Amino acid sequence: GYLGGYAAPALAYGAAAVAPAAITSQQSNILRSYGNLGQVSTYSKTVDTPYSSVSKADIRVTNNAVYAAPAAYAAAPVAYAAPALGYARTALAAPALGYARAAYAAPAVAAGGLLGVAYSAAPAVAHLTYSGLHAAYAY
């Protein structure tokens, strides 16, 4: 009998299965300053295929230079207290047979000074500072 519809063909027509090529590249570089006091190191790598693309980069900066900067000191807080002002009355003398009371004077209370240190929320005062030989960053 005839088995043409059920058997595999003897020849296969068409292109062979080929994986498309991938393109890759990588680079590294180190730039050093005079006397090797500071350096910038870079590394990058890329892989590209017809279906995807991936890149990675790493950049590192080091600075071992000695740099002297004056220390900044905050000014001392100033607190001011107003003087306590009072008014004293004299007591009149009672008749000889009477009882003389001393005038009552309330204790003088001075107004307190201002708080010596002002506190803020942490995110409002958080900052970063970097100082190098030729660069300074702060925020």
From Swiss-Prot:
Sequence repeats lie at residues 7-10, 68-71, 75-78, 93-95, 105-108, 121-124. One of its GO terms (molecular function) is structural constituent of cuticle. Transmembrane segments: none annotated. The keyword Transmembrane does not apply. Keywords: Cuticle, Repeat. The keyword ATP-binding does not apply. PANTHER family: LARVAL/PUPAL CUTICLE PROTEIN H1C-LIKE PROTEIN-RELATED, PUPAL CUTICLE PROTEIN C1B-LIKE PROTEIN. The tetrapeptide (A-A-P-[AV]) repeats found throughout the protein are also present in many proteins constituting the protective envelope of other species. Component of the cuticle of migratory locust which contains more than 100 different structural proteins. This is Cuticle protein 76.
